[in-house]
Structure formats: structure tokens, C-alpha cells
């Protein structure tokens, strides 16, 4: 009967079961164990996969391995057996598989190129090296060529191609002149990654040198030089400015593939005049700041150690003042195989189960191939104890015959990985690896560890016993580690004795003993005191020591922390140091150091030496004061369920009495390693009862305090754990706030270790709609927040958070009120526009019907217009209680369009729009009334701080700013960008409780009640801008200025307190920026975002019009025309006779209003003004013309001096009567100037 195959879930279950098994056996590094145990071979050293060698040296291909017995080696070349014995040039090193190919007797290294693989074999298996590809380095010569001079126009782009000869490895390229001077590279001239030299625009100075491409080859250490290029630059009178264009890469898009772990290099080189600047961006995200860096004057972007998240679209932006272009590079990240779980050597005992796992990833997904002893697993003899499940080999009930070396080969199109892992089956009884019957001496109250290293297969079980009896030592004051070491946390006298460790497995047992002796600590109980002595007297410093009598005591002295030389004037005894005939050089600090081979203790005193005339009247005043020494020998007694007594020995007060002792504690569950203050006690006590919280593993230390400062903390006490209990409190600072319009986030401050009272602290969160009597919703949370979803907009909720641990629940929690998320408000109701007179427009409105949150104010946008002519948009922000506003009109004929919207924390809602009434003297517009214009940047630099609806105006219309008169009026001496903000109200405005209505008319708002930033003013130039603002923060507050250019590059500038105004100095001419100011301590408090534009920079490339040929020719033509007209006039004047007046008479008057072209909105009373063209003298007469026979005297509108055919009626007189020029005609001259009227 054929064997039925198990379903797939059986294999999965088996793998999960094996994962739960203990780890494999590790062989210790003990040489005796290593030499005794048998072991399959393991590759320990090999050459790299791509092995490039120097043809001038002998070839060395490394392969070394270990095993017991020692392995033998053989090689394959190009997958075929490589017979070393047949080639006299090839030899193998002794006790190694390393190949040496010797060319001293001749031969060509190229003949040995190929793919090599090493095999290490003993009777337990065969291990394989990587497939090593051997290549010989090549450095070919540059082909001979004659290069003609390169002719290029000044300002044009140029590429000098290098085209180096192919080498192995690729050579390093650099450019130099024929005189071996390096070519200076900058933003305009630079070398690309391909080795070519790029000129963004050629200048005349580029002819001063030649250009030679050089290739440096690594292995041969040689440099090949290409014939140099010479440039011939054709000059012009002026170099035309050009928009950027890409020299490399070509086109608007390209793609690039890179392997994971490699470096990604993107390059963009552009031409243009002026030289373009290059900026880099990633579509849909930011550049990785930790891996990205810019090279080659920003023309190259390098991203190191590429990973899959670095794939995507990158684009470079090349820009100068003439314009900008961009090139998009689509980056695809592939991956050669890399290890997720590399197979490890497996050492098992007979009958044990185990597994080999080989998991790798890559792009595309790599395939896995198993081999055993170098042969495919499919062709190996069947083994019933072995099963292959994809990337895992499962071994069950292994036996000695199961020993082998397995290879996992995982590969894709980009590379491969090969790993060896052997399976060794050992049956070894337990063995002790440390010396027997060790003696360990320790000091009382210290921590110590007793080691007992062991080995066996199967892995033995280790137990500890004391004095040969009793139960296994583990728990309480003892802790046994996995390696067999026994730790005693705090040594006491009763811990002295003989400790036995016993290792046991199915093959037997082994034991070892360790004798522990506990010694008393060394203590100085009579310390030397600070002394003041006169010169020439005798001084004695005491130092009496208590120590363990079984230990040898050594007492030594230090002066100023250096070993003291005991001379003839000094006498050292067991318990003192005497100094005879004290001199000034004896002044300083003296340290008594008492030490044994296990510990030591120190005590310090200061000796002050006075001159003969000095008298130590105030001894303490002469002694230096210092911080106290640390307390020592902490001891816990009177252990109770909720209290413990802590006792300590005070340290030296260093001439300043100890005023306080601070007791600190540390717990190892919530914040291990962090010390907290527990209590404070007077300096006169050295013992105190500490009240404790349930379920805390306490450890204490003590700090002494005097008037100089605090001592170093004492060494920590032993730990003491209290029993658990239900919590006695609940978390604080419970809040409910919406982060979106349809949710509510419930947060609280989590409880600390001293309030948890038990294990598994958690929180029961309850919520329901306020005043609905609904059933409470509840959930158990382990963190400090919970988000309730699918909530209505801005609805109040009742919230409760209760603490709970494994011992029970905390007290009933208090109910707090939270709100779900806000949304945009509806439009203000009953928006009304009234015009009581021609100078004032009054606005009134009611609060929105649906605030959808807390109203923080209103935003009014309004713009004046006259027909299709549009003025500048104005923006006003109001407090949430304001419902009236007045606008003072700039002129009596302009109308206004208003847009009013309410604001919540989310933003501005739907707007209510109205228009002012039509003035009585305004002409009916031919087009639809204009809507609010978008915020635009004018040439003056005055910019609105908020957006508005775009205006659809005809192309003939000219937008003219009309600024209404507003009270109070603010006149700025510089053109600036200003914004206003309004503080948020703390309560919601509703129709049930109408707020107090206020009226205001303003441009710049006054400071709000809450902390805010307003009146941000920007004074821009071409490359810098000055920023000022107003705020109502406390003095000393720091701010941050954040601005973003039109390329979406964001920068921030920290501003110290009282540092206004500040200057932004890294701006670009003619670029638009958005800017805001916010508090450094609270980014949520920010000014309104404003927009401004820097002015266009002046460049020296601007052409002088007076030097242009076309202008000179035009001037010459005008001069010639004027000369011809003068000659004609002279001829006509000299001829006399009849004048051809018909042409003059038929010319119609064509008045043109310069104000109409100018687009002015000025109005004038033409009936009450003198005609602009008249030039009346003081006596009311028109002045005599320069020529008596001028044609003006015979123009239309005068008395009839011509007949119907245009001939003269009378003779042409030399002088006309003065009276003919007087009368009513003088006020109605027919000059064309008089026909010009202002068109309102």
C-alpha cells in the first residue's frame, strides 16, 4: 500500500512544536573538550566571491577549515575537479586548503581565470566554500587619437567626454591640465559620475588652460592620461541669459535600479545663464536625513545603505532667475539574497529532535536549495529521521548515523548566499569544567557569585546544595543562572559554608564543591581630625582600624592624594602618624588608607600650618568646609507588611554639621534604575521607620546634606518586596477630547509603581453620552489612552477611568466630562449690510446655527470694486463675541463685497456673503459683480495673510488697490506684510445664552486675553527679510520662526527672548514664502500663516540700452526726420502765398484722457476748474504768440477769416490787433488739451 502523504497543516504544527523545544547544545571553548569530541568540518576562512588579483604577484586563493578529525581538501574549477598534482605551478599549503599559483618560472595569470570552489571533508561530512570567481586585474592603455580644438560660443554649454579604457576594476577618473595642475571645479564646471567634464556655460577664461582626462588603476598603481582638449571660445558683445536645460540625464524623466545595501547615486547636471542651482526632492515624502548627502556642488544625491523604503520618485529642480525645469528619476530597489535566519550548527544527544532553518529574503524572492555534504539533498540516500519542509529540515529521534554537513544555497538573479551547518550527535556524560574545591572569601553584606561551569550531552540539569543537605538553593536570597552560577544577593554570617553543585543527565552525574568564607569589613573607627598647628610644633594624626583578624591589614598614608614619603621628621605607627617640627610644606590633606586583600576603607583630614605670629584664635574658621561623606552600612530591620526600619552609619561631616538625611528608593518594575525621594529626616538621627506601598520591590539609599551641599549617595541596601493589594486610587488628569470630527480620545496620567499596589495594572474605561442615561460602554486598557470612534460632532460624554490589578479594583472613579471632535461651523446667520451714509458701511450678524465646537472667532474678507475694477482685499479677525463691525469707505462710489465665516479649532466654516448697496452715482457694471480675489503678491510687497475666493475679471480690466479708511488708521513707513490673530474663547457660544455683543473697527487687533501671537510684520528685500510680531507671553519666552519657500523647503529659526526684530538671511530673490511664528514651549500657539515675496535681485548682466545698436539707429532716424521737417518748414515760410488749410481743417479733434489709461479712480468737478490746456495771463488775456503768421491764429473756432473754398479773405497782416485775442474766446480755446476730461 502506498504511503499516504500528511496534509500541510501537519507540517506546520510540527514546526511550531519544534520551535518550542530547548536550544541545541553548545560546545565549550575548553581545549580539552574541543580536542576530545568529534566534529564535522567547518569553513573558517575563505577568499571573497569576486577575487581580483594583481598579475605581477602569485595568486593566492584561501580556504581553511576545522574539524575532528582534521579535514582534507580538494577544489573544483568551473564545476569540474581541479587536479592540483598535474599542474607544477599550483600547490596547496600544509594543513590548509589554500591554493598558491606561482608564476616565477613563467606562465600567464589569465590562463587561471575561472570559478573555484573548496571542499573540506572528514568522515563526518563535507563543508563547501563560496564559489570564488578569480579575475586578473587589467589596466589597458588609452587609444591614440588626435583631438581638434573644441570651438564653442561664450555662454553655451559644453561636455568634454573622457571615455576611459575598460579596466578591472574600473579606474578612478580625474581631470588635470597638461601641466599636471588640477582643474578647478565649482557649480559651473564639474566632473560627472561617468567621468565627463561638464560646463554649464562656457566663459572666456576657460581658454586659459587645456583639459586632460586621467585614469588611475588601483592594482597596477599607474595613471593613464588622455590627449588634452583645447578650447576656442567665440566671444559676443553680451551673453544672452538662458533658462536651464539638462545636460545629464537627458529628457524629463529616467529610471534607475539599485541593490539593497548599496549606495544610490542620483545625478543632475544642468546648463543655463546664469549658472542654475540644483535642489533635490522626493515625491510624497522627505529625503532620509540620516542617509542622504549632497555631492558635486548639489548636482549629485547619494543615499547610503539603500533599503526598500528608499524606492520611489525623486526629482531634481534646476533653477535660475530665468526659470526652472525638473527631471524625475524613478528608483527601484532590488535585493540580492540576505539572511533572515541563517542555519546554525546543531549538536544533539541521541534520540533528541532538532531543526535547521534557512530563511532569506530578496527581490525577487530567492529560491532555496538544500545540499548534504556538497550533493543535492534529492540525490542523497533517504533518511527516515529527516524531513524537508521548504526552508526547514526537521530531525526526529536522531542517532549517531545522522551526522552530516548541510548546505543551504539561496539565490536570485542578483546573487546568492551559501551557508554550512553541521548536525552532530554526541552522548557525553556530565563534566565539571572548573577547578575542584575552590575557596572563595567575601566581605559581609556584599553580593557574590559562585561559578560552576559544566558540559554534557544531553544537556545536564544543575542543582545547588549547602553543607551537603537541604533542598535545592533557588529563590529568595539566591538566584541560579542558566550557565550554572549561583548568586547570593547579600552575604550574611550564616551564608558561610560548603556549597555543592550537581550536574545530572541520563548518562550520569558530576559534582563540584565551593567553600565560602564570610569576613568582617575593614572599618576606620577613629578617624584623623582636621588640625591647625603653628610652624615648628608636633602634630599627631590618629587612624584606628577594625578588621577581620584572619586577614592581613595594611595601613598607609597619602598626602594630597599621593603616596606620602615617611622622612626623618615623621613617624608611622599602626594607629597614628606623627609629624615633628611642622613646616609650611606639610600643609595639605592627609588620607589614612586601611586595606586587606578583600576590601579597604579611607579617612581624610586637613592640616593647616600657621606662621609664628599667627594664633589659632578661631580654629574652626581656618578649617575648610566640604560636603559630607556618604553614609554607609545600610541595614533593614523590623520588616513589616507596610513598613521597615532603615539604619545607617553617618559619614564625616567635613567641618559642617549634617542638617538632613534624604532617603531615596528604587523599584525594578516600572522604572528600574531610577531613584525617587521617599522621605527626609533630621541630621541628628541615623535610623528611621519607612512607610511602604503594596507590591513594590524596594531598594533604599541615603544622602547626607549640610550647608555646603549633598553627599554622594550611599551604596544601596538589600531589596525588600511588600505584598500586594487592590489599588487605593485611580489615574489622574482624565480628559476626553476629539482628534477628528467623529471620535473622542480619552487620556489619563498612568499610575506609578507606588500606586499600582499589585501586578498587571490595567484601567477600566467607561463612557456614555451625557444626560442620556444610556448604558455605560466599557473597555479594559493597559496603556494611557483609548479612542472612541463613530461619535457625533462635538457631543459631551461622561467618562470614568478605574484602576485594577490582580488583587482587585480601585475605588469608584469620579465622572469627568469630555467632548467628541469638532467640525467646521455653519455660516453666520442673518448677515446684514447697512449703509447709513456715503462714508460708513455697518455690518451685523448672528452666531451660526450649528457651531460644531467652540467658536474661537470670525474672519471677515472684503474687497472694494467699481464695475470690473477691483481693489485690494482686506481681512479682519474678530473675537467670538463680536457681532458688529464698521467700514469707512475710501470714496463714495466704490462698492464692497463681504464674506464672513466663523472659526472653530478645526478651521473656518461656510461663509456668508453680502454686497454693499449700489451708490447713486455708480454706473451699472457691464459684467457680473466681482467676487473676492485670491491673495496675491504685488510689486510693492504688501501681502494679505489669508486666502480668498478668486476673481473672474476680463483681461481689459486693471486691478487697482483701494484701501478703505479704517478707524483707527495705521500708517506704515515701510511696505510690510501684517497678520492678526484672535485668542480662542473658553466656552461655546450658543443661541440659548447669547453673548455680549461688541462692535469694533480695526486693522491691527489688540492683545487677546489668552496667550497669542499677532501682528506679524515682514519687511522683505531680495535676499533677506526682517520679522517682528506682538505677543502677550511672559518675559523671557523663546519663539520659533518657520518659513517655507515655493519649493516646499521648510526651515526654522529659533529666537531667543527679547531678540526682535530678527532677520532671515538665506532667502532667494523673487521667490514666494509662507511664514508663521509659534512658541517654542507650545507649538500649538501660533500666528496666522502669511505669505510674502522677495524682490527681484539686481544683476550686473542687465544691458545698457544706450549701447544697443537698434537704439542708436532709432535716434539717428529721428534726428534725420527732424532735420527734414525743419527744412520743409523753412521753405514754406520763405515762399509765403496761400496755405493749404484744408488738411488742417479736416483734422478732427481726438481728445484722450490720460487718467482713463492710468486707471485712476479720482473724481473732479470739471465745471469749476480752468481748462488744463489754457495758459491765461494775469490780466485775463492770452499771450501773444511768437510768430505773427502762425496757423493757430487761423484755426477753427475763431472769427471767419476764410471763405468756403478755404482762401484768404483779407491780406496777411504783420501784426494783428490785441483786441482780437480778447473776449469770450479766450476761455474756450480749441487746443486739444482742453478737450481732455477725467473719466471717473
From Swiss-Prot:
Domain notes: Homophilic adhesion is primarily mediated by the interaction of the second Ig-like domains.
Family recorded in the similarity comment: Belongs to the immunoglobulin superfamily. L1/neurofascin/NgCAM family.
Organism: Rattus norvegicus
Disulphide bonds in the chain: 63-118, 162-213, 268-316, 358-408, 452-501, 543-592
Acidic residues: compositionally biased ranges: 1154-1165
Compartments where located: Cell membrane
Keyword terms: Cell adhesion, Cell membrane, Disulfide bond, Glycoprotein, Immunoglobulin domain, Membrane, Phosphoprotein, Repeat, Signal, Transmembrane, Transmembrane helix
Assembly with partners or alone: Horseshoe-shaped homodimer. Probable constituent of a NFASC/NRCAM/ankyrin G complex. Associates with the sodium channel beta-1 (SCN1B) and beta-3 (SCN3B) subunits. Associates to subunit beta-1 in developing axons as early as postanatal day 5, during the period that nodes of Ranvier are forming. Isoform 2/isoform 3 is likely to interact with axonal proteins in close association with CNTNAP1. Interacts with GLDN/gliomedin. Interacts with MYOC.
Phosphoserine found at: 485, 1160, 1174, 1187, 1190, 1226-1227, 1231
Entry-listed glycosylation sites: 305, 409, 446, 483, 752, 778, 866, 881, 1015, 1026, 1047, 1101
Tissue distribution: Isoform 1 is expressed at Nodes of Ranvier while isoform 2/isoform 3 is expressed in unmyelinated axons.
GO cellular component, one term: Schwann cell microvillus
Spans annotated as Disordered: 710-740, 902-942, 982-1002, 1141-1240
Lineage: Eukaryota, Metazoa, Chordata, Craniata, Vertebrata
Protein name in the entry: Neurofascin
Residues spanning the membrane: 1111-1131
MF-aspect GO terms: cell-cell adhesion mediator activity; protein binding involved in heterotypic cell-cell adhesion; protein domain specific binding
First-listed, main subcellular location of the protein, grouped into a coarse class: membrane
